[in-house]
């Protein structure tokens, strides 16, 4: 592998960073994180891991994160790129199993090389389930980013509890917070419900939330009521959406002040007066901008919904309360612990201006590692010795063997796929998405008869 990006005092070169992501939201997190933790304007090469959630061109445009280059790859193809290309930093914006597989693959392709990229990983939003599993699958990166003080404490406790090195845990904040602070009501007053692909999962739960949103629009004809959707039918996001709200909405007669909207969440928040959700990360974006925010309790406060994360936030409320005009006030101490306390401008709200320094620790740590003459080998907690019944399956999903090398028959990476192969891949992905959103629910209903 060639040396990292060379530079001289007279001709400094911008840092070079690679981001590997497996969905639209993780691409957004990875690309924006790279911009937050590196100085200047880094040269960013994006890689989209081929799979069920590979974002479409429309989703990439909506996310808004830009790259100097962008290509779709398998894990094996990506590892071959890492073996021959030079980067300063690598951001792994993947589900936990993907991170673990790539870490083991990198360990093999970088074997015996002290000069390698600094490897960074983390979470795209609220961590409310599979805490230990997800964290241990991310162990081995040089930095494991925690989006709040609370998460940093929990992450360290998990690593230390299993005897793993916890020094990689680094407190930051969500990289996509920002935008103008809320300055008062708009005309018309706008209520936004941030939908989630898999929360709630049941048809009954999703139909109930949609019906209540439409009812709110009828009760308040002076308000604009928006259903903010993550994806269009046939597209996938980080989580599988079996019952799109678009499909459920076809059966409703909605009032004229109710609409379905897409687009960048930041732009939607620019006109929002009341953000409503079950447990979407959009709630944290809204709280950061001091927009009145509600986390719904209608379906209970449950781990399965993720809204238990907001216990103590002051934001929990029901549709009945909202219909009656309730506007919650967030608990400032809770908000500060989530890393979203800055209210836009310095001095606004609790911890105003703190977001500007939220990434300092990560920048300093990366600078230290880049200045080191050599970096140690990647050392994940999971190995064939510590997890012999778990790790091989994780690696095999990405066509990697127990040693991190490609399995026999793994897709070739020496050349770009031909036109026929690309068409077959797109057709297969479309068939999978059709099966998830149309065939699977029918089969499930038949099984309940």
What residue spans do the PLM features occupy?
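C-terminal amphipathic helix plus adjacent low-complexity
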Residues: 323-449
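Active-site and donor-binding regions of nucleotide-sugar-utilizing enzymes
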Residues: 15-45, 50-165
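Nucleotide-sugar donor-binding patch of glycosyltransferase catalytic domains
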Residues: 292-344
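Nucleotide-activated donor-binding/catalytic signature segment of Leloir-type glycosyltransferases, i.e.
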Residues: 241-263
């Amino acid at each position: 592998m060639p040396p990292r990006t060379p530079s001289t005092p007279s001709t400094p070169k911008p840092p070079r960073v690679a981001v590997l992501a497996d969905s639209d939201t993780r691409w957004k997190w990875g690309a924006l994180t790279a911009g937050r933790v590196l100085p200047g304007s880094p040269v960013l090469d994006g890689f989209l891991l081929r799979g069920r959630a590979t974002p479409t061109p429309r989703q990439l445009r909506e996310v808004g994160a830009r790259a100097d280059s962008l290509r779709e790859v398998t894990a094996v193809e990506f590892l071959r790129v890492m073996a021959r290309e030079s980067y300063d930093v690598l951001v792994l914006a993947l589900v936990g199993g993907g991170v673990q597989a790539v870490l083991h693959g990198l360990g093999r392709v970088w074997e015996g090389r002290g000069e390698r990229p600094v490897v960074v990983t983390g979470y795209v939003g609220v961590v409310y389930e599979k805490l230990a599993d997800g964290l241990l699958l991310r162990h081995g990166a040089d930095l494991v980013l925690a989006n709040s003080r609370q998460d940093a404490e929990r992450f360290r406790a998990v690593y230390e509890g299993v005897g793993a090195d916890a020094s990689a845990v680094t407190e930051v904040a969500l990289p996509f917070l920002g935008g103008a602070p809320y300055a008062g009501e708009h005309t018309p007053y706008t209520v936004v419900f941030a939908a989630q692909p898999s929360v709630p999962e049941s048809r009954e739960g999703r139909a109930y939330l949609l019906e209540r949103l439409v009812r709110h629009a009828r009760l308040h004809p002076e308000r604009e009521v928006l259903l903010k959707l993550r994806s269009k039918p046939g597209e996938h996001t980080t989580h599988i959406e079996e019952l799109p709200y678009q499909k459920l909405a076809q059966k409703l007669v909605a009032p004229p002040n109710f609409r379905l909207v897409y687009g960048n969440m930041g732009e939607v928040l620019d006109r929002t007066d009341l953000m409503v959700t079950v447990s979407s990360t959009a709630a944290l974006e809204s709280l950061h901008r001091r927009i009145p925010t509600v986390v719904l309790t209608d379906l209970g406060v449950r781990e399965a919904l993720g809204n238990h994360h907001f216990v103590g936030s002051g934001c929990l409320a029901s549709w009945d309360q909202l219909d009656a005009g309730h506007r919650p006030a967030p608990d400032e101490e809770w908000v500060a612990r989530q890393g979203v306390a800055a209210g836009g401008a310095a001095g606004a709200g609790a911890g105003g201006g703190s977001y500007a320094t939220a990434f300092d620790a990560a920048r300093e740590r990366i600078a230290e590692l880049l200045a080191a003459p050599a970096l140690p080998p990647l050392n994940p907690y999971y190995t064939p010795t510590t997890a012999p019944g778990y790790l091989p399956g994780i690696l095999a999903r990405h066509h990697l063997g127990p040693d991190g090398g490609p399995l026999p028959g793994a897709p070739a990476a020496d050349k770009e796929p031909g036109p026929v192969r690309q068409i077959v891949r797109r057709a297969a992905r479309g068939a999978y998405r059709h099966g998830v959103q149309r065939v699977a629910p029918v089969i499930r209903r038949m099984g309940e008869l």
